[in-house]
């Protein structure tokens, strides 16, 4: 029996208001990931623009149920560069009504006229809605319950058949079944069914021989019908986020495919028949359970993007070297023990993801991949790189070697960092930064050496003049060299968890510094020059041995976060009241801190104040428990400045009540001005 024969003609009742939407200026959506049509009339979502029932390209966008149809768009989390543009749909209310009165469920005005002949008890209730753009009341029917999605699909398919629509979007519509009448939509070139509840496709899907794009992502598919092989023009097939335990065999017979998404399924193996898909340029097998990638991958010589990340691969076949057009190869989050030497054949490679595997080395042939701009092997067990490899990759701008077993910098000298602006060597076993290693790295702005074994910094640190972010946390540094003053472009300096006892006075030269983190060191005194860091926003000093803050701290007008908890503070300077931008203040666990300065109440932007485990004898416990606002209010109420203000208020009242006194307005302004002036002087 021919599944694609027309058979009996189905009912041609169409969604009239949606049809009107297409004839009244809908804008067609575009792209393989799908979007809705333009704004339609009434409350029903508009489809793409058509010219009545013509042979031109047309679109039907369906949003499921009655009521206003929202925009329907598709997303591609894998590769925006390889995904077609998304369309967009819309809906309008009163605009469509002005052109042709419609009901909220898409029926024409003729149906509303028929309601007049209905018995009163069955007649739809009429309500009046006043639209903001018009004072004239407009009648509309009370919204009924949404029509079953599967019933609306039948109507949409009928219209698709009758109008020769080429692009049909039924996404996000709670569809469970695609009816067999889909076979009649022979003009379709794009069909979007993503984000539904479809468990299987009907065999009649194979009748859509003109289909080029088929989006089935985010459903519950476990298989595909064999008849799909009749769709011999299919180029884009999206099966992401389904329940496929294997790649359906029919896919291997779709030799016209150029883009195949199989991400986030339950696939455990890839058959040798994969070699038949010679036209593939993009293949995503990300987030499955694949343990082996066979030699068939080498037959896909047109591949430009291959994503097999987040699987269980232990090895790659040597045949991967045949995919000479690859520009992006993502292998991260697998269990790879090695990379084949043939990787060096991929001279077009720009991005190679090897993060979080079990690699102990990388092949020297990687130096042939000179188009790479990023080298990232984070989260492996690598102890050293092949000699001169990084220097050969002269286009590198970012190098990430963090979370490995490096005991020293890669061999290759200063030449390997010539064009690099970011280096990350966090969490290794490196005990020194070689002198002059960054002498050619004129563009280096970011260096992360956190969690290593550094005991000192190189004598030429003063030459790192373009450095913007320097992270030296969790090492064993005992001293910060005076030459740090030359890093005048520095904005972020992180020195937490070291063994520093003092900070050099030259720190004041870092006028662009926004973040200074000195947590968990052995610092007893801060230099007065800290007050020169006028751009500073975060100052973290917790867990040190600081007994007092310098009065110059009051000059840090941009400071929003100050943490001095777990120190030996005896008092806070009055100048802390000048920190008008301060939002968070941590002074908890200072066992000698018994009182707070009244000037703290001048920090009007303070949102968080932690005074836990401070023996504040002057502030009642119930006030302390009430949070920063209550503490600040208490400080205001008990401030000596308040007594001065009260005196002036009393004086003002006396003057205003005196016989022949001037108007209240003038006296009030003068007194308030005087009080404000004194307040300003205090600040």
UniProtKB/Swiss-Prot annotation:
It comes from the Eukaryota. Residues 1-19, 74-86, 672-683 have a biased composition (Low complexity). Residues 26-49, 661-671 have a biased composition (Gly residues). Keywords: Leucine-rich repeat, Repeat. LRR repeats lie at residues 164-185, 187-208, 210-231, 233-254, 256-277, 279-300, 302-323, 325-346, 348-370, 371-392, 395-416, 419-440, 443-464, 466-487, 489-510, 512-533, 535-556, 558-579, 581-603, 605-626. Belongs to the SHOC2 family. This is Leucine-rich repeat protein soc-2 homolog. It comes from Drosophila sechellia (Fruit fly). The gene is Sur-8.
